[in-house]
């Protein structure tokens, strides 16, 4: 992942619709005479799907439901009772396929860039709030607008918690990413299944902890970084930290295996 590839123009006819007003096909990286490091492509463009490309689209009849937009449809795979709704898994599969197409053309730049997008979606699918919106006994309460705002703030709070752990260079979190060994999975579908099922199994404890820590705040406003700092100073984040280490470790292990296998398949790794 530490080699350089030449930046190439986007030349693909895709079946996937984007918000063209917020989709940039030019390069964002700091290149070196038209060349860019592969690790830099993966790091830079793994955030690209959150920059607006999936917003403002009419892609699913499920957008009829309150609080559901095209970004939600493409970045989540929500389980309600025994039903799995939305297209987060298809987003991952799609960009894995596009990456393979690019590598088959010897277009390494777009091979890595499409792969970076794929990694974004599998990371989304590893997160509890991208797989569940609430416990099944309370899911009908999402019809209430105030309760939907509360749940969105819960989701945002957990996203911010991950950012908090990275900001403080939490050693256990970094160890979970760096030192978890690859966990085998036979293909992309099994990868998605194993990552999602583990995430779903941890949803209730994550959700309960977020509510326990910040319930009074969440009914009024979004949680802020300083709220985590205060809670951490009081030793109140330990349960949330431990379950998060488990979620991240599971994601890291499965993704490492997938990447190694994928890189061999496209002949980027011996």
How should these model regions be labeled?
Residues 110-132:
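Active-site alpha-helical segments that house and flank conserved acidic catalytic motifs
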């Amino acid at each position: 992942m530490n080699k350089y590839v030449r930046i190439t123009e986007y030349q693909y006819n895709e079946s996937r619709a984007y918000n063209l007003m917020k989709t940039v096909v030019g390069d964002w990286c700091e290149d070196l005479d038209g060349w860019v490091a592969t690790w830099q492509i993966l790091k830079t463009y793994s955030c690209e799907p959150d920059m607006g490309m999936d917003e403002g689209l009419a892609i699913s009849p499920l957008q009829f439901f309150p609080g559901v937009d095209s970004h939600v449809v493409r970045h989540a795979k929500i389980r309600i009772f025994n039903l799995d709704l939305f297209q987060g898994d298809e987003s991952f599969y799609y960009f894995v396929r596009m990456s393979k197409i690019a590598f088959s053309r010897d277009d390494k730049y777009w091979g890595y860039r499409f792969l970076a997008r794929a990694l974004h979606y599998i990371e989304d699918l590893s997160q509890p709030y991208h797989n569940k919106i609430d416990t099944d006994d309370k899911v009908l309460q999402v019809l209430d607008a105030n309760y939907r705002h509360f749940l969105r703030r819960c989701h945002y709070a957990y996203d911010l918690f991950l950012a908090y752990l990275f900001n403080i260079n939490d050693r256990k979190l970094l160890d979970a990413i760096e030192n978890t060994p690859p966990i085998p999975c036979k293909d992309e579908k099994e990868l998605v299944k194993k990552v999602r099922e583990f995430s779903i199994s941890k949803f209730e404890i994550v959700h309960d902890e977020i509510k326990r820590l910040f319930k009074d705040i969440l009914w009024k406003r979004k949680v802020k970084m300083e709220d985590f700092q205060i809670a951490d100073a009081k030793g109140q984040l330990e349960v949330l930290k431990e379950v998060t280490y488990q979620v991240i470790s599971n994601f890291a292990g499965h993704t490492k295996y997938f990447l190694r296998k994928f890189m061999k398949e496209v002949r980027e790794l011996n």
